[in-house]
UniProtKB/Swiss-Prot annotation:
Molecular functions per Gene Ontology: histidinol-phosphate transaminase activity; pyridoxal phosphate binding
Annotated EC: 2.6.1.9
Pathway annotation: Amino-acid biosynthesis; L-histidine biosynthesis; L-histidine from 5-phospho-alpha-D-ribose 1-diphosphate: step 7/9
Key words, A-Z: Amino-acid biosynthesis, Aminotransferase, Histidine biosynthesis, Pyridoxal phosphate, Transferase
The keyword Amino-acid biosynthesis is assigned to this record: yes
Family label: Belongs to the class-II pyridoxal-phosphate-dependent aminotransferase family. Histidinol-phosphate aminotransferase subfamily.
Reaction equations catalysed: L-histidinol phosphate + 2-oxoglutarate = 3-(imidazol-4-yl)-2-oxopropyl phosphate + L-glutamate
PANTHER family given in the database record: HISTIDINOL-PHOSPHATE AMINOTRANSFERASE, HISTIDINOL-PHOSPHATE AMINOTRANSFERASE-RELATED
Protein name from the UniProt record: Histidinol-phosphate aminotransferase
Subunit structure: Homodimer.
Extent of the signal sequence: none
UniProt source species: Vibrio parahaemolyticus serotype O3:K6 (strain RIMD 2210633)
Entry-annotated residues carrying N6-(pyridoxal phosphate)lysine: 209
Length: 346
């Protein structure tokens, strides 16, 4: 049956999520999930009815949290669907292109490749920042420029002045899509305030990370009202199930926000603990991280990754040579991981 598939799909290499890769163990630090398992109440009495396309309570709650108007907010099945909607809505297959800066999140490329949209890449500089000159020279036919900050997998923040320069550079030419999936761990670095000045800015958000709701699949796109209305033309009729909307609204309540803030503080402290401990091991390079993960360069990254895997510590291998990404778990998970790595190099 594969021969009946579209040519692009036949040639497509799927994104290998942490769950697809699998593994067995008791320390799971491979998917940048939160270690907190919070409880919520759900009303199952309305499951015979379809959900609203854009549940008003959810849109209002997230808009208030993000500091934007409800008209500037769209909710979807995770930020991944937001990526797909942007590509489908703004890119003509065989004509337009997206641009992204590796090493970075893999779904930008997959979403474009799936529908036959060209992918242009301008690698990050040696310190993981934007190569603005390289981007400018590759903007022909580009409709979307994806920038992840904090960047996955490197963990760094993209310089704000470079983001502003990029927005100026792409005015009336392309949309800059800021992927802020991890911004709740460093909210002061958000670009949400730039929405008022730049109509060519879109921002992706999620409840998967800081809100500990990876299994819920609830994300958001923030942009000007005109851009949001374009996305509403191509979104599925019922993208957010009733239980998802109900749980998300609880997470965005006053009590839910207070809990998320406390848990972010806890995870940031664990990240600092892990960063300091790893930095003291000779031969390791620990890159500064602003999300709930750290990128670490080992003398022999593949061997370290496999050894950890074999002992039940599941980390995330990286396409960057000898680098492994380590999610920040609870203190016990961080201690076990740090202890294993110390012993491995002792």
């Amino acid at each position: 049956m594969e021969k009946l598939a579209r040519k692009q799909v036949q040639e497509l290499t799927p994104y290998l999520s942490a769950r697809r890769i699998g593994g067995t163990g008791d320390v799971w630090l491979n998917a940048n999930e939160s270690p907190f398992n919070n409880e919520y109440k759900t009303d199952f009495a309305r499951l015979n009815r379809y959900s609203e396309c854009q549940p008003k309570a959810l849109i209002s709650a997230y808009a208030a949290y993000a500091g934007v108007k409800p008209e500037q907010t769209l909710t979807s099945r995770g930020a991944d669907e937001g990526i797909e909607l942007l590509v489908r809505a703004f890119c003509e297959p065989g004509q337009d292109a997206i641009l992204y800066c590796p090493p970075t999140y893999g779904m930008y490329a997959i979403s474009a490749e799936t529908i036959g949209v060209e992918r242009k890449t301008v690698p990050l500089t040696s310190d993981w920042q934007l190569d603005l000159a390289g981007i400018e020279s590759n903007l022909d036919n580009v409709k979307l420029v994806f920038v992840c900050s904090p960047n996955n997998p490197t963990g760094n923040l993209v310089k704000r002045e470079d983001i502003v320069s990029l927005l100026e550079m792409t005015k009336d030419r392309a949309i800059v899509v800021m992927d802020e999936a991890y911004i709740d761990f460093c909210p002061e670095a958000s670009t949400v305030d730039l929405l008022a000045q730049y109509p060519n800015l879109a921002i992706l958000r999620t409840l998967s990370k800081a809100f500990a709701l990876a299994g819920l699949r609830c994300g958001f796109t923030l942009a000007n009202e005109e851009l949001i209305n374009v996305l509403l033309k191509v979104i599925a009729p019922y993208p957010v199930p009733v239980p998802v909307a109900e749980i998300a609204v609880q997470a965005l309540s006053e009590a839910g926000l207070a809990r998320a803030k406390f848990q972010v503080l806890d995870l940031n402290a664990n990240r600092a603990y892990l960063q300091v401990g790893l930095s003291m091991i000779p031969g390791l390079q620990v890159f500064e991280g602003w999300g709930n993960y750290l990128l670490v360069k080992f003398p022999d990254g593949d061997a370290l990754f496999k050894a950890a895997w074999d002992t039940g510590i599941i980390l995330r291998n990286s396409p960057i040579e000898n680098c492994v990404r380590i999610s920040v778990g609870n203190r016990d998970e961080c201690e076990k991981t740090l202890g294993f790595i110390r012993n491995y190099y002792s």
